[in-house]
Structure formats: C-alpha cells, structure tokens
C-alpha cells in the first residue's frame, strides 16, 4: 500500500531511521566538499556538519514528535494541514526546483568518486549508471528499500572513511606529522583567521536550518515506528555527525600535507582515492 511504499509502513526502528538520517546528510557530495574544506581551512571545516548536528538537536527537541504524529507522507502535505493548499503548492515548487540541483550534485559527486576508481571509464557514463541505480532501487522498493540501502551505504562509507584516514595519517606521520606540515591556523578551533564568528553564524543559519526543515530529513521521520523513535533518531544522528565531521576534515588536512597544490578543492578526495 501507500504506507509501505512512501513511509516504509511507518514501522522503522531507531537503528534504521538513525542510519538513514545520517546517510542522508553524509552523501558523496558532502564528503567531497568537506574534504575540500578541510584541505582549504583546516579544523573549522567541521562546522559544515556540526551546525547540522545542532539543527538535528533542535528538530528532536521541538519538532520530531509532532512531525511523526501528523501521519502524512510529505513535507508539503504537512504544511497544507497547517497553512492551507497554497503553502503546499509553494513548498512543492521550491522542493522540486532545489532538489534538481541537489540530486545533480550527488550524481556528479558519485560519478567523480567512481571515476577516481575506474579512470578508464567515461565519467558521464558513470554518472548515468549512478542515476539509474538510484532510480531503480527507489521505484522497485520504495522508502523501505531506501532506508535499508541508506543504512548499508552508511556502514560502507564510515568504514571507507576510517581506512582512508588511517592511510593518510600513516603517510603524514600521525597527528604530530600533521602539525609539523601545516600552519597553526589549520588547527585553530572553533574559529580561525579564515573562518570567523560571522562565518559560523552564517553556517548555522543557512546550513543548520536545512536539518530542521529539510524534506529529506522529514521523509525519514515519517517512517519511524512512533514519536519516540522519531525524536531519538534525530538525537542519535546528531551524535553520529560529530565524529564523522572530524574524520572527513582530518582527511582533507592530511591531503593538504601530502599534496599541497591540488586545485580545485573538489578534486582532493578523488586524488586521495587514486593515490
């Protein structure tokens, strides 16, 4: 039925919902982007995900239980119940327009990662394959297929990031070698000369707010077994974001020590994979 396809039967437990939430905001484009930020500015780059963790805590404290309680399928439906059909239409148009770009970025990032591994293939062909895989498992399995695939992708991603970090740190000479190779500004936290309090506030407003009202986030909460699972999953995903943020940025910092002249920054992660 519709519940099964759109919201996984509203039966997902905290492990699946947390895993799916985390995989949702730790996609290939975020990893590539954050590695590049770590390469460019160092530790302050973790705020790209840490503001998301703050947003998820706000979501868990004030909204997650209410969102799950309504029992709708989409964010526009939720807005319609609160503000009428005009709000639903406007939200639908905004989501479609913005998510064309977001999906394109994810496909581009996935294609870049695969191209780093299979350089003999045309990158456009790899992007088409990635897009086809996304569409096929979504159409065939619905949301339950998505959240299970998200969970598997998260495990693979975290293992891959840990292995990559270990290899990079080994080549650099550990944290001590990293400190010897980079200027002190790379280790300045929470702010630095290149990333001040103003930048942090802008990050919090523009990026953190996405985690409070994002349709991709809400679609996972709609799948939760009950209100308690929805709330606790938001908290758990926020907690998971913290170590992942530091792992990804440290990879970027290690890459800066090993390959100081990579440009543009979105080529840092593919370069690491190729090496």
Model-derived features: where do they sit?
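Loop-to-helix transition at the N-terminal end of transmembrane alpha-helices
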Residues: 3-21
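Hydrophobic/aromatic residues in alpha-helical transmembrane segments
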Residues: 34, 63, 75, 106, ...
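Membrane-helix interface/capping residues of multi-pass secondary transporters
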Residues: 2, 43, 85, 123, ...
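Loop-to-helix junctions at membrane interfaces in multi-pass transport proteins
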Residues: 9-10, 16, 33-45, 80, ...
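Hydrophobic alpha-helical segments of secondary membrane carriers
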Residues: 9, 93-97, 149, 236-237
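Membrane-embedded alpha-helical segments of transport systems
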Residues: 21-30, 53-56, 96-104, 156-159, ...
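Helix-loop-helix module between adjacent transmembrane segments
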Residues: 23, 46-139, 206-210
């Amino acid at each position: 039925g519709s519940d099964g396809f759109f919201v996984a039967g509203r039966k997902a437990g905290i492990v699946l919902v947390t895993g799916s939430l985390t995989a949702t905001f730790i996609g290939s484009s975020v990893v590539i982007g954050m590695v590049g930020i770590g390469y460019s500015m160092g530790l302050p780059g973790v705020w790209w995900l840490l503001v998301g963790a703050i947003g998820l805590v706000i979501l868990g404290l004030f909204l997650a239980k209410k969102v799950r309680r309504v029992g709708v399928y989409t964010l526009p439906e939720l807005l319609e119940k609160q503000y009428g059909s005009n709000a639903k239409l406007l939200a639908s148009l905004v989501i479609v327009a913005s998510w064309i770009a977001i999906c394109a970025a994810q496909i581009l990032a996935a294609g870049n990662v695969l191209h780093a591994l299979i350089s003999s293939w045309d990158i456009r062909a790899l992007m088409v394959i990635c897009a086809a895989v996304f569409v096929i498992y979504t159409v065939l399995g619905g949301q339950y297929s998505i959240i299970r695939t998200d969970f598997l992708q998260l495990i693979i991603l975290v293992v891959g990031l840990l292995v990559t970090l270990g290899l990079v740190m080994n080549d650099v000479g550990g944290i001590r070698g990293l400190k010897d190779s980079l200027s002190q500004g790379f280790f300045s936290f929470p702010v630095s000369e290149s990333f001040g309090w103003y930048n942090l506030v802008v990050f919090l407003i523009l990026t953190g707010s996405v985690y409070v009202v994002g349709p991709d986030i809400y679609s996972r909460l709609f799948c939760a077994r009950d209100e308690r699972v929805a709330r606790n999953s938001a908290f758990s995903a926020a907690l998971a974001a913290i170590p992942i943020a530091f792992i990804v940025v440290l990879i970027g910092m290690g890459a800066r020590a090993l390959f100081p002249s990579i440009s543009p920054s979105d080529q840092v992660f593919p370069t690491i994979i190729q090496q």
